[in-house]
Every structure is written in C-alpha cells, then in structure tokens.
C-alpha cells in the first residue's frame, strides 16, 4: 500500500529493506490495523466513504495507495446501496469505474485475492506510483487516499497528479493520521504508538515494520501545513476535519478550474472535532 522506495530514501533506508518491511505485513495488514487501532479505523473509514466521498453510481473513482482494497470495497458497497435506493440493479456497477492504484505489488495481490473471495469483480487494479499516475487528464470524479499519502516522498507532486487526473468539479479526499489536538489524548496516544503498537506488531508480524509505520506518522505535516499543500496544488474549497481528537484527519479539496487556481494563505475552515460530523464542503474564507 505504501510507496516504499521513495519513503526509504527519505528515512535513510535501502530500497530492499523498506520493500521487505511492507512485504512482511501485506498478508496481515488489515487484521493488524484492527488490532492496533482497536477497530477505530473502521469507524473513520466508514465516515470517510459514506459522509465525505458520498459515492454515486456512474462516477469514476481512483483510490491511490489502496493496495489491500479496503476503501475500494467500501466505495463499491456504498455505490450498490445508493444504486438500489435509486432503483438501479445493485449487483452491477454499470457506468461506474473503481480503480485501485498502488506501487506495492504484494499489497495489490492481497487486495485482488480478497476481491475474488468476496465478489468484488468490477474493480481495476493498477501497479503504479502515485507521483506518476498512468491516467489521462480529467479521468476521475473522485481521488481518495487512506493512510498512504504520508509515505510519498514528493507529496506536492502527488497532489498535483491528483489535481491533473480529476475532472473539473472532482474532489480530493485524504484520510491520514495527524497531530493530536486533544491534550488529554497526547500522552496516552504516545504510549500507545511507541509502546503497545510495536510490541503487538512483533507478535503479529514483526516489531520493526510497525515501529517504521509509527515513525512515518510522526514525520507527517500537521493539519494546517498539509491543508496549505493542497491549496498550493491548485485545489479550492479546502477544509479538514479532525477525528478522535486529531489522531486522524480528513482533508478535502475540489478541482474548481481546469488549471490550478492561485494558492491562498488564508486559514482553513475550523476543523470539526467529532467523527460524526459530515464533510459538507464550504467556501474558504477570504484572505485577510
């Protein structure tokens, strides 16, 4: 699921080592996420897909760094449910396209196995870098990336690629770990991340791999910094929403023009500090 070669260079690790890290967790990645987050990641992802992405039949979806297919499956399920409510046959995705793009072939293989096992036969799987997407300009209505963008070495380039492949009116949706904003959670989260998670990782797969993942979380920009990066890539209507006291965050931006708009430096819309809030997009405030 992760862009291991470039991330490895950033952290001073060899490509072979970092590839080994993510290959080692590929078969247990989803299960380990359940154990290490106590299942909370499922609540975040449900809110992310159903309330923020809001998939509609007939749309084109690209999920980047989504090798095991979790978000793509949720998008597919949501489309089928919405299609049924509109009187569309729910077993087909006629006119809808869901594409998973990932640079890690083993993650993709695990996703394809699950797709075959659970009947998700309408999903396309593409092995490619999020920084060099093999898709035409304006090909998608929605670009999602869940717990993956922190591992891109050139995030500005990845965001520009997201802008390029989206249609005008298309939306960028990013779900990622972030900076804790609730003081009461800071110390417990630190103990959880650097105490329990690596030890649990050692029992389920290997400690080194999950210590590596925790370090990548710490290295990711804070909410405001990343929101500005999205603006700098040309997106409008940029906003973010903190989940569980800022442990995770949903970032949203809209491609409002064919070419990138001039970035603003205005402060973002205040984050909503509840995972139950919806992701209704509102205009950014004017710059001071």
UniProtKB/Swiss-Prot annotation:
InterPro entries recorded: SAM-dependent_MTases_sf, UbiE/COQ5_MeTrFase, UbiE/COQ5_MeTrFase_CS
A GO-annotated cellular component: extrinsic component of mitochondrial inner membrane
Biased composition (Basic and acidic residues): 279-288
Catalysis performed (reactions): a 2-methoxy-6-(all-trans-polyprenyl)benzene-1,4-diol + S-adenosyl-L-methionine = a 5-methoxy-2-methyl-3-(all-trans-polyprenyl)benzene-1,4-diol + S-adenosyl-L-homocysteine + H(+)
This enzyme's EC code(s): 2.1.1.201
Region of interest (Disordered), ranges: 260-288
Involved pathway(s): Cofactor biosynthesis; ubiquinone biosynthesis
Membrane topology qualifier: Peripheral membrane protein
Pfam families: Ubie_methyltran
Any one biological process term the GO annotation gives: methylation
GO molecular function annotations of the record: 2-methoxy-6-polyprenyl-1,4-benzoquinol methyltransferase activity
Composition skew (Low complexity), residue ranges: 260-270
SUPFAM superfamilies: S-adenosyl-L-methionine-dependent methyltransferases (SSF53335)
Keywords attached to this entry: Membrane, Methyltransferase, Mitochondrion, Mitochondrion inner membrane, S-adenosyl-L-methionine, Transferase, Ubiquinone biosynthesis
Residues binding S-adenosyl-L-methionine, per UniProt: 68, 102, 146
Subcellular location(s) of the protein: Mitochondrion inner membrane
Enzymatic class: transferase
Note: This protein may be expected to contain an N-terminal transit peptide but none has been predicted.
UniProt function note: Methyltransferase required for the conversion of 2-polyprenyl-6-methoxy-1,4-benzoquinol (DDMQH2) to 2-polyprenyl-3-methyl-6-methoxy-1,4-benzoquinol (DMQH2).
Subunit field text: Component of a multi-subunit COQ enzyme complex.
Family under the similarity heading: Belongs to the class I-like SAM-binding methyltransferase superfamily. MenG/UbiE family.
Protein name: 2-methoxy-6-polyprenyl-1,4-benzoquinol methylase, mitochondrial
Species annotation: Leishmania donovani
